[in-house]
Amino acid sequence: MDPMSNLPFTVAALYCFAPLPQYESLREPLAQLCCANGIKGTLLLAAEGINGTVAGSAGAIEKLIAHITAIPGLGEPELKYSHASEMPFHRMKVRLKREIVTMGVEGIDPLKSVGTYIAPKDWNALIADENTVVVDTRNDYEYAIGTFEGAIDPQTRTFREFPEWVKQNRDRLEGKKIAMFCTGGIRCEKATAFVKGLGFDDVYHLKGGILKYLEEVPREQSVWNGECFVFDERVAVGHGLAESDVELCRACRRPLTPQDKLSQFFEEGVSCAGCYAERTPEDRARYAERQKQVKLAEKRGANKHIGS
């Protein structure tokens, strides 16, 4: 039995690409169901499908997934489950968007062309091939706390920058097997579609993303190093999807390892080595006052996410 399943909150990361011409009409029923069942997190709806991460009781999440699966034309979403000791979200948001994952390139359609899916159990063999180039499609702050052995860091701040990186690094990809990965798989749907559209044929991506790999591949067989950043209050997870000791800098929202917190530039709620030089003394004074109010609120038993 998965020891993590004893934790009180079930976290579901999901996405599905499917034509949803009437996606606006789906927003209110989803929001009502989530609020009625104590579910929190974010769901994105667009004409191309649905994407999001939510948390709640196991029964509540089961109701939500049944509702989503029953949406006409949508079908079974790609799902990754994990568990949390505390509710990892502060509120519930259902948003209408142009894209369910923002790449900013017109005409990219994973339903028409996408890379070859590689199951977690087969991933190690693919990336060990000397003719394979491994590309981390995530952002630089995600790469910084964990990635696969030998993976290239495109040093992007947002996914919108990824297409330009590919164009500028074609020579590193030519004649190679291109193996891409991301947190849960959705960014790779568009990344592999984009790369294939440029004429590359041997394009692969990790099915279910890092989360599925960490869930299914035993630690002793794993070639993952570090933690996997997640976009909720857990901040990061490790092998077996266990909660990690990575925290967020509340000034810039970069992930911080225990080692990062030893920096002379780290002050809780005020700055870290990554953002100290980016902020003015006035900014830091303002953050310090906010942190003071957060601590006072915690002492009173108020919501601990004030200022987060």
Curated annotation (Swiss-Prot):
Family: Belongs to the TrhO family.
Biological-process GO terms, alphabetical: tRNA modification
Presence of the UniProt keyword tRNA processing in the record: yes
Organism whose genome encodes this protein: Brucella suis biovar 1 (strain 1330)
EC main group: oxidoreductase
Gene: trhO
EC number(s) recorded for this UniProt protein: 1.14.-.-
Key words of the record: Oxidoreductase, tRNA processing
Catalytic reaction(s) noted: uridine(34) in tRNA + AH2 + O2 = 5-hydroxyuridine(34) in tRNA + A + H2O
Name by which UniProt lists this protein: tRNA uridine(34) hydroxylase
Described purpose of this protein according to its UniProt entry: Catalyzes oxygen-dependent 5-hydroxyuridine (ho5U) modification at position 34 in tRNAs.
Ranges where the Rhodanese domain occurs: 128-222
Gene Ontology terms for molecular function: oxidoreductase activity, acting on paired donors, with incorporation or reduction of molecular oxygen
Active site: 182 (cysteine persulfide intermediate)
Superkingdom, natural source: Bacteria
